[in-house]
């Protein structure tokens, strides 16, 4: 199947995943530099009364002579409009950067900032909410595949190498960035029985949107590159609905024997629900096969 056909097929499937509030699931596959890549995703709405605020992307594209795998989790708060906007625009903005192939880290940083600026400009339409983001881009060259992960907030990327979990993203917690927040004139609350919050409101120190808090928040992503080699088993992307109740290594151990990526993603979300996670849960598993 041609790259454009794969892209449209997967894009349509993921868009369809938000037509209801029930569990949604899907999968796809491709070849990158001779390596078989299979992915699966699963989403479950949490216990809150608001509509589903987790969105994801799982698709393949071509950029010049390079085949790409594009995967992302967007965990919204105070509404679904910002994560929905990110799902539709963030990867397009990244790929439009002229230095994307030569310097993907710089391209991603620029695109994150440009996208956040657009969200803030469009606050009248998009509302006062915001979103985390974790993006993972597989870039194939003639003989290798490289993974570039970026994130703001607490949605997480974890890779399994020979069965050992390695976190590629950074959890942007308010306490960790207290100095920066206070330097900008904000504060971090630490009320008994609650998590630390920026200005007593938001439980992450970096996010897209959140116009009312933006003076004290950052949308600057942490970005890291990781080679996909013979020791790479799979990649997990998930919102904090999973990570609140499961460690990185526990997640890897739960699915290490799964051959089907979709079944693995579904299993992780079900385990999170069984462990009393009340938040929306979205999970993507990307498996790498020789």
UniProtKB/Swiss-Prot annotation:
Catalytic activity annotation: O-phospho-L-seryl-[protein] + H2O = L-seryl-[protein] + phosphate; O-phospho-L-threonyl-[protein] + H2O = L-threonyl-[protein] + phosphate
Cofactor note: Binds 2 magnesium or manganese ions per subunit.
One MF term in the entry's GO annotations: protein serine/threonine phosphatase activity
Domain of life: Eukaryota
UniProt binding sites for Mn(2+) 1: 75-76
SUPFAM superfamilies associated with the record: PP2C-like
Segments forming domain PPM-type phosphatase: 38-288
Cofactor(s) this protein requires: Mg(2+); Mn(2+)
Enzyme class: hydrolase
Residues noted as binding Mn(2+) 2 in the record, renumbered to the chain: 75, 240, 279
Keywords: Hydrolase, Magnesium, Manganese, Metal-binding, Protein phosphatase
Disulfide bonds: none
Name recorded for this polypeptide: Probable protein phosphatase 2C 62
Protein species of origin: Oryza sativa subsp. japonica
